[in-house]
């Protein structure tokens, strides 16, 4: 097994536990950087000419019909407590017939003991798309075919997410910042993986140029995971300070900008939308919009900006912690349905053709 995956598994477990606790209780949202979705206003249709009861929220992703254009994004796994979280997320995904991504499966490759925390997902969500997940540093180091098979078989995965987390690794106390050779290894991975590969940022966004490189390496779906939601730099900075104290790694003048580093979600969608429009070979690529999604109106705006589905992690984690996961998803779908009614859209295909205008926001 490669050097990266030989890291003691108890360190990985501690990190994953820290991540959930910090995301639930810490102040780790972007400051001064928003998703950019608030800049848009969806045009009202005073004469909708439809029956609200006839509105259909169903969508497609990778050829699969799903109940709505929403995905429960990758969060956690690989330790005992994660089994309960993942089971509940999977039950919600099955209830609403929406896709689900698991957290990084590196731990499943390091230690057989905690594989059940991932396996529970497919048991609880037998009929919806479920996606495996591994990090870019692990891909750059080289994954064996047997390791890929282990991840996919464990959850009977419909796709493999490769998460791109350079900014997170930079701030992580035990981070791996060696991304050299990643694109070549990604091309090798996509060639030998029997399911589609999804490239996903974790909160700093994917530009059109990065999307082009990823697509050319064989990626079929881009999850932009733009800035405006959870800053994983802030999550890791909390862990760093707890371990080493308030030791200065970066100049005070730069630290705030680095903690809030990233491309807003809306900007990512705009850029990749232009890439697809101007280059026919990229048009089949599907887009997942995540990074700061807070409501069904945000979901609607991402659909109008070219996404196939929107996805959320942090907001839904908090909803689960509050015992309101199903209620929150239900409200978001009601939000989306309201927008569709007020734009005269019976389907998502019709919604995609509606207009948005840029608001004049105060400076």
From Swiss-Prot:
Localization in the cell: Cytoplasm
Taxonomic lineage: Bacteria, Pseudomonadati, Chlorobiota, Chlorobiia, Chlorobiales
One CC-aspect GO term: cytoplasm
Predominant place of localization: cytoplasm
Molecular function per GO: FMN binding; isopentenyl-diphosphate delta-isomerase activity; magnesium ion binding; NADPH binding; oxidoreductase activity
Role noted for this protein: Involved in the biosynthesis of isoprenoids. Catalyzes the 1,3-allylic rearrangement of the homoallylic substrate isopentenyl (IPP) to its allylic isomer, dimethylallyl diphosphate (DMAPP).
GO process terms (BP): isoprenoid biosynthetic process
InterPro entries: Aldolase_TIM (IPR013785), FMN-dep_DH (IPR000262), IPdP_isomerase (IPR011179)
Superkingdom of source: Bacteria
EC numbers on record: 5.3.3.2
Cited PANTHER family: ISOPENTENYL-DIPHOSPHATE DELTA-ISOMERASE (PTHR43665:SF1)
Catalyses which reaction(s): isopentenyl diphosphate = dimethylallyl diphosphate
Oligomeric form and interacting partners: Homooctamer. Dimer of tetramers.
Positions of substrate binding: 15-16, 104-106, 168
CC cofactor: FMN; NADPH; Mg(2+)
Entry keywords, A to Z: Cytoplasm, Flavoprotein, FMN, Isomerase, Isoprene biosynthesis, Magnesium, Metal-binding, NADP
Entries under SMART domains matching the protein: IMPDH
Protein name in the entry: Isopentenyl-diphosphate delta-isomerase
Binding site for FMN: 73-76, 104, 133, 200, 230, 313-314
């Amino acid at each position: 097994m490669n050097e990266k995956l030989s890291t003691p598994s108890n360190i990985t477990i501690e990190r994953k536990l820290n991540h959930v606790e910090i995301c639930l209780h810490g102040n780790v949202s972007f400051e001064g950087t928003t998703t950019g979705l608030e800049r848009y206003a969806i045009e009202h249709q005073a004469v909708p000419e439809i029956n609200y009861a006839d509105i259909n929220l169903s969508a497609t992703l990778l050829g699969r019909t799903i109940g709505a254009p929403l995905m429960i994004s990758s969060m956690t796994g690989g330790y005992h407590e994660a089994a309960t979280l993942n089971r509940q997320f999977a039950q919600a995904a099955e209830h609403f017939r929406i896709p689900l991504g698991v957290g990084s499966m590196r731990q499943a490759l390091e230690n057989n003991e905690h594989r059940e925390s991932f396996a529970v997902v497919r048991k609880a969500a037998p009929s919806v798309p479920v996606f495996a997940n591994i990090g870019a540093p692990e891909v750059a180091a080289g994954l064996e075919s047997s390791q890929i098979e282990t991840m996919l078989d464990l959850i009977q995965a419909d796709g493999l997410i490769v998460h791109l987390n350079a900014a997170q690794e930079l701030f992580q106390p035990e981070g791996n910042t060696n991304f050299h050779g990643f694109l070549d290894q990604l091309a090798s991975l996509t060639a030998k993986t029997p399911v589609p590969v999804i490239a996903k940022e974790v909160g700093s966004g994917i530009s059109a140029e990065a999307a082009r490189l990823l697509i050319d390496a064989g990626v079929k779906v881009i999850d932009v995971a733009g800035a405006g939601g959870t800053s994983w730099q802030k999550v890791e900075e909390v862990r760093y300070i707890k371990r080493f104290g308030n030791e200065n790694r970066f100049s005070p003048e730069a630290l705030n900008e680095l903690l809030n580093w990233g491309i807003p979600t809306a900007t990512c969608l705009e850029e990749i939308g232009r890439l697809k429009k101007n280059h026919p070979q990229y048009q089949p690529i599907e887009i997942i919009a995540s990074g700061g999604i807070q409501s069904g109106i945000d979901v609607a705006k991402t659909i109008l900006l070219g996404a196939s589905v929107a996805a959320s992690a942090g907001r839904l984690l908090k909803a689960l912690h509050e015992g309101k996961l199903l209620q929150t998803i239900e409200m978001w779908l009601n939000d989306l349905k309201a927008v569709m009614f007020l734009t005269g859209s019976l389907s998502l295909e019709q919604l995609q053709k509606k207009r948005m205008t840029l608001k004049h926001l105060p400076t």
